[in-house]
Amino acid sequence: MRIGQIAVGRKRSLRIQFSPKRVLDMPILRAEIPEPWRPRRLRRAARALRKQGVKRVLVPAGFAQWDTLESAGLGPVETGEFCRARAPAVALAALTGAHIRPEGATVVLRGERVTRAMRMSALKLCPEVKNLLIAAPVGGAGLQAELRREYGVPALEDAPGRAPDLAIHFAPSAGGGARIVDLSGNNPRMDHFSFALREQTLPEDCEGLPLLAALWETGRLDPAEITVFTDFHS
């Protein structure tokens, strides 16, 4: 599925200009739209992108006119699967930001069922943290048994009496914790986190997280290349 980009047009230009580009080796169709971005102008660009097979677009940080783009058939690059795949790095960054050593931390993974992302997160976090709690009605017991076989230590079941230092939610949950990171949904809010590449710089004319998600889902990004930072304290 082709990905597009909405970008600010050149100064003194009155026309919307379309051009194929490569962003970190990913092909995109870029629409440069002169400011101010009035709804009619955005719709015109969106319709032209749709005719070229574009359904999802990258936009500048702070873009607030999704209703206009969606009315023309364009949507965002969803980031949920990418964020859940990066849950171990997010968890460790959150603990570091809260000045909690992982080897002394209790972390709970919560979801309606054990997904691939939850299982992989549990396998990576279990040897890193003191206690790993699993809260998943479907598949939770099986995952705990797998962790016991793999690491020889129990992965505990989440319970009201236990107060984890950090809770990672893979689906909407009412469970508590000293710190909660909600990774559920198509586009989880990651206000306290930032993602960067170890050896490359992300372009400044589009939001970084959707770009990373697009690179990851198209197989152009090794998760080992990504670092996660946070100012998450509560």
What are these regions (language model features)?
Residues 1-7, 157-192:
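Short, well-ordered secondary-structure micro-motifs within conserved domains or adaptor modules
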Residues 1-24:
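N-terminal basic/disordered segments at the start of proteins
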Residues 31-41, 56-70:
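Electropositive, gly/pro-rich neighborhoods at or near active sites that engage anionic ligands
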Residues 41-53:
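Short, well-structured alpha-helical segments in soluble
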Residues 98-162:
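Glycine-rich phosphate/diphosphate-binding loop of Rossmann-like nucleotide-binding domains
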